[in-house]
């Protein structure tokens, strides 16, 4: 009997993930408090918002935040695209706590305190640059059906300073500890020099640097910063709308998402040891992945439409799930599967929130 059971431990050994060290995953971005509500079309029209978009607040949106709170039933959630992804990754990883690090700028105020306590609850090692010139940033998530229109008032998030935070020895040490880096394209509007410093470090040390296209306006109005960092990007994330805008801005002359992924994959690259991978999600449609040799499509998990509560954060959650397996050097297919799993959990809840433990095997 004993002989027949012998191979078992061996099998377990192969599959048991290697123990992770703290701070193995590093993220940097705009920490925002999400103020989300289900709104009507009139509200979107009043502030000329598209149903499914991400924009930065302008003068004409000043009243929007007050009206949202006054007119609709709002929920407050700790948000910000990168911070969401980092939290989801930490949730999927579970142990050790503080496997994930997050940098960003907040104000010295109530909202800032909420973000700090929420990061601690999620076991993320958050190191915020705190300043009192601007209040903590907020993001209005205006939900209609399974669309969400995001209006970000960056405020404090916009005040992140490389020389005041990233460059400090006790902070930079955390960058050096990481093996995988993730920054949403949104942060290019705040501190492109911080993004570049981390990206260069990753390339020089053959570590994995990942970036998200984040929103159509990044490819349009922050093209220079985006393309300056692109040669350092090992894994590029985005959704179908962002991919289409990126392709148009780059003169790819195709609207086919697989072709776009292929062309983005082939853009110039600094660290030739790591060919780029491009991952484009498309809501309920297949996720498209381009590697050096092929373009593949992966079906998302079947979801009962009635169970979908809030698609805000689905893209962030996908990235978080993906990163949670990437830190273990799992194959691409496993990273995608984890991404799809995490997104499927998040869309059944309000905000980018999750149950106590994941059920991913």
Curated annotation (Swiss-Prot):
* Protein's GO biological process: AMP salvage; dAMP salvage; dATP biosynthetic process; GMP salvage; purine nucleobase metabolic process; purine ribonucleoside salvage
Cofactor section: Mg(2+)
Instruction: Please indicate which superkingdom the organism of origin belongs to.
Output: Eukaryota
| Mod. after translation | The N-terminus is blocked.
Q: In which pathway does it act?
A: Purine metabolism; AMP biosynthesis via salvage pathway; AMP from adenosine: step 1/1
Give the modified residues of type Phosphotyrosine.
Answer: 76
Q: What is its EC number?
A: 2.7.1.20
- Assembly and oligomerization: Monomer.
Specify the protein name.
Answer: Adenosine kinase
Gene source species: Cricetulus griseus
**Name of the gene:** ADK
